[in-house]
């Protein structure tokens, strides 16, 4: 077996849809095509939105499709726990490393303040934090804490972080201009995705991260966190988003071709084969198992632009 360790990191807030399945398929194929293994981590930081029964269903669905992980989830393994809701003490340890470096500060801004007209926006519509609370005095912090419980942000430098994505190619962002100081912890104490995912992938030995292109812009800040925390960073492969026939992004909330509905109409091999066809991995939507696709898998066959599902494919 090679040293490649891929991973699934789904958020179990509902049944998986075709976009989630596509990401799992490519992550599995990318790892297995080089003789590697796959770890399943359940990203249930917000345990209220992510009940355990959805995580159990997710595991069963992956097994039904032939995409069962080698480690993690309810199967366990040497680097657990594999549920983020059970890893708060681990996140606290690494959060405190950033605190000791003087990089963490309280933020009292409301949502309306963050979306004020004078706040800079990225091209994707996300607000770049203006640093309103970055230089508060100790006295100001005491006064504001009496009125409002703060969230916690990390100070980023005016530095450009660049990397070469395994699929999308070169990408760079200036942290101060394109990202801004980002959240590490919510006011209710829940740790933010950006910190948790970095700590988890490093401690679980993940060497290859396959995820949607919508997370490409998160990578520079995560690479910076890896560096600040002294953790090894994986290679990144960002895949195109799978879109509905009308060009709309697939959503669990909208029930877009959830696996629950697909299971009533198709065999596992039919679902895998049609997804592989949509991703350019085969020339026709013929039924296939993941194992049958692994030997011929190549990222060069996967498009870089968003994939619109052909009408009538599902």
Regions inferred by a protein language model and the residue ranges of each:
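Non-catalytic terminal extensions that flank enzyme cores
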Residues: 1-15, 33, 38, 65, ...
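Noncatalytic linker/hinge segments flanking ATPase motor cores
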Residues: 17, 81-89, 146-148, 194-199, ...
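Short, mixed-charge aromatic SLiMs
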Residues: 46-56, 244-246, 295-303
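Charged/polar, solvent-exposed surface patches and flexible loops
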Residues: 60, 93, 116, 131, ...
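Short secondary-structure transition/capping segments
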Residues: 82-97, 121-128, 148-158, 278-293
């Amino acid at each position: 077996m090679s040293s490649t360790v891929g991973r699934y990191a789904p958020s179990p807030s509902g049944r998986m849809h075709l976009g989630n399945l596509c990401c799992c398929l490519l992550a599995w194929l990318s790892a297995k095509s080089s003789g590697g293994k796959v770890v399943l981590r359940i990203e249930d930081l917000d345990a209220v939105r992510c009940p355990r029964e959805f995580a159990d269903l997710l595991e069963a669905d992956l097994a039904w499709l032939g995409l069962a992980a080698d480690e993690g989830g309810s199967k366990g393994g040497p680097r657990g726990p594999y549920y983020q809701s059970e890893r708060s003490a681990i996140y606290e340890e690494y959060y405190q490393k950033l605190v000791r470096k003087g990089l963490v500060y309280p933020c009292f801004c409301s949502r309306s303040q963050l979306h004020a007209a004078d706040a800079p926006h990225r091209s994707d519509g996300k607000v770049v934090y203006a640093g309103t609370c970055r230089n508060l005095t100790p006295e100001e912090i005491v006064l504001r804490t009496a009125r409002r419980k703060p969230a916690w942000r990390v100070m980023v430098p005016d530095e450009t972080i660049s990397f070469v994505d395994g699929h999308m190619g070169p990408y760079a962002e200036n942290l101060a201009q394109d990202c801004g100081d980002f959240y590490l912890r919510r006011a209710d104490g829940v740790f933010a995705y950006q910190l948790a995912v970095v700590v988890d992938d490093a401690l679980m030995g993940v060497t290859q991260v396959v995820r949607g292109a919508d997370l490409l812009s998160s990578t520079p800040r995560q690479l910076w966190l890896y560096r600040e925390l002294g953790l090894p960073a994986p290679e990144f492969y960002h895949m195109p988003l799978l879109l509905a026939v009308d060009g709309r992004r697939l959503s669990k909330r909208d029930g877009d071709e959830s696996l629950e509905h697909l299971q009533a109409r198709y065999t596992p091999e039919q679902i895998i084969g049609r997804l592989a066809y949509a991703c350019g991995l085969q020339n026709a939507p013929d039924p296939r198992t993941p194992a049958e696709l692994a030997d011929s898998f190549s990222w060069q066959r996967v498009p870089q632009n968003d994939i619109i599902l052909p009408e009538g494919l599902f």
